[in-house]
Amino acid sequence: MDEWLGIKLATGRCSQLLRRQLAVHAARRCYDVHNILDEIARLEGLQSRAAPTKPAEPYNRNPLLKGLWHKHHFQPRFLFANLKRETKRIPFPESTEEFNQNPDWKRLVYKLVFGAFENRTRRAALTGEWIVFAPLNGINYYLTLANHSTGDERVYARAKSCLSEFPELQPVLRS
């Protein structure tokens, strides 16, 4: 993992916690860790093969997480959720009645799957789970992975556990 991170990090620093999470995901083969590493490379301003995901954003919903940011990374298993969100966002131009009278299943499937995915990628709006990091003085500190069901307190506790490695983050991770 350290060798791969060495290729993807320009000035950023990566916590031992995140390194362990990546190693576990690689060993279990439950994530393509290279997709995560490519997102880190993108955040570092390096050439990247990363999927067109949403831009990095600060955590705004909870003051506890102020100063932390998250960046989506995409995995194939997130495809259905992305397609579902996209098809809800953009209704079909044809009416249901018109389709019922002359069903063109191939066109419908294409629009539901390929069309929705193309729209989402064109807008760089793919979503997935998160890389949690803290930008400070031009350096990104990559702390942990999280998902939509990881509670804010847990994200904060994981991030705060990295203070022994990165004491300079104390102002960001104030309690």
Over which residues does each language-model region extend?
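Hydrophobic/aromatic beta-strand elements that line small-molecule binding cavities or substrate pockets
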Residues: 131-132
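Basic, Lys/Arg-enriched alpha-helical interface segments
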Residues: 1-128, 137-175
